[in-house]
A protein has these predicted regions:
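Short glycine-rich substrate-engagement loop in P-loop NTPases that contacts/grips substrate
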Residues: 69-84
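Structural recognition of the conserved hydrophobic beta-strand(s) that form the central parallel beta-sheet
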Residues: 98, 134-141
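Conserved P-loop NTPase "ATPase switch" module shared by AAA+ and STAND
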Residues: 91-113
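Conserved nucleotide-binding/hydrolysis micro-motifs of P-loop NTPases
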Residues: 22, 41-45, 103-104, 141-148
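P-loop NTPase motor core
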Residues: 11-63
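Conserved P-loop NTPase catalytic core
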Residues: 145-189, 193, 197
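Substrate-engagement module of ASCE P-loop NTPases
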Residues: 86-88, 117-136
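Single conserved hydrophobic/aromatic residue that forms the stacking wall/gate
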Residues: 1-10, 190-200
Length: 200
């Protein structure tokens, strides 16, 4: 879940050949952040309630923090936001959160509004207006929900497959990638570019 201390050479190889590696600020940002990756579906599938899921996320990330930063005098090891803030206050290394399938609870528990609200409260408390956050990136199918007066987590820019501006050039497949995939799977490029026809 937490990437810290990966060798500089490994991280350079990770980005080798990508456009980002040629950016003037690439070196400036390399190895400057703690990265926490969470796949929320993995946590949800191992628990019965939202409270259990949040507790498991807290336990897992907390354990990673304790392993990476054992020398810190943590205020309260049971409160994730306190632990993250303690790490940031001691080392001044901000966190990047990558949260995959952030919306899994909305898809699997559609009618459980109380659980959904608790989950949004957890995310808001974890991410919104926190000095330890450099960036949070969440993937999912559904847009970020708002509940009446409950502002939830309204600090995100939302991009979709149908409206990816201004990052559209970085999403989907380039023509060259489509050609390579067609060659790899022995498909006709003409066949791929034709719209799908459905039987009536």
């Amino acid at each position: 879940r937490m990437s810290r201390g990966l060798g500089d050479v490994y991280k350079r190889q990770l980005f080798q050949g990508l456009k980002i590696a040629t950016h003037p600020d690439f070196e400036k940002h390399l190895n400057q952040y703690n990265v926490i990756h969470l796949n929320m579906q993995n946590f949800l599938s191992k628990t019965q309630t939202i409270e259990q899921m949040i507790a498991l996320v807290t336990k897992a990330v907390g354990r990673d923090l304790l392993r990476a930063y054992p020398d810190i005098d943590y205020l309260d090891k049971s409160i994730l936001t306190f632990m993250l803030d303690d790490v940031y206050q001691n080392y001044q290394v901000p966190f990047i959160f990558i949260i995959d399938e952030w919306d899994c609870i909305f898809r699997s528990r559609k009618n459980q509004l109380e659980e959904q609200t608790k989950y949004l409260d957890f995310l808001r408390d974890l991410l919104k207006d926190k000095g330890y956050i450099a960036l949070a990136y969440m993937t999912g199918i559904l847009p970020i929900k708002k509940y009446g007066e409950h502002s939830a987590i309204n600090v995100f820019y939302e991009y979709s497959m149908t409206d990816a501006s201004p990052i559209e050039e970085f999403t989907g497949f380039t023509e060259q990638e489509v050609r390579q995939l067609c060659e790899q799977y022995n498909l006709s490029l003409i066949h791929i570019s034709e719209p799908t026809r459905h039987a009536q």
